[in-house]
Amino acid sequence: MPLLRFDLIEGRDQSSLKKLLDVAHNVVVEAFDVPQQDRYQIVHEHPENHMIIEDTGLGFNRTKNLVVLSVTSKSRPEEKKQKFYRLLAERLESECGIASTDLIVSIVENDNADWSFGLGEAQFLTGKL
């Protein structure tokens, strides 16, 4: 059950935003083997001057299509992470027109005790999930 948080520069139309979210979800399902109905996505839109993303030495020129994606998830093997990064970059470029140089991804790992879906319980620990 990965939680995806998207930080975007404001101004995308609803159709483009929906496509971005759908593509990201389909990649999570494929790369991380999660069920199709496990969809947890949050979008934060910011004025352009509120996202200061400078060059990390790779020579990229970022555009207003910038996507900064934070994924909170249980630990996964490096191969699955690499597959996720690759598929996401490929599909966002081919299906959404977002250059792979406009994609930044960070994965933060946690454990079953770190999730509660309500009722004051950690459902992964209680066996309800």
Curated annotation (Swiss-Prot):
Assigned keywords, A-Z: Isomerase
Residues annotated as transmembrane: none
Function comment: Putative target of GltR.
Keyword Cell division: no
Gene assigned in the entry: yrdN
Protein name: Probable tautomerase YrdN
Pfam families: Tautomerase_2
E.C. no: 5.3.2.-
Active site positions: 2 (proton acceptor)
Isomerase recorded as keyword: yes
MF terms (GO), sorted A to Z: isomerase activity
Family statement: Belongs to the 4-oxalocrotonate tautomerase family.
SUPFAM superfamilies the UniProt entry points to: Tautomerase/MIF
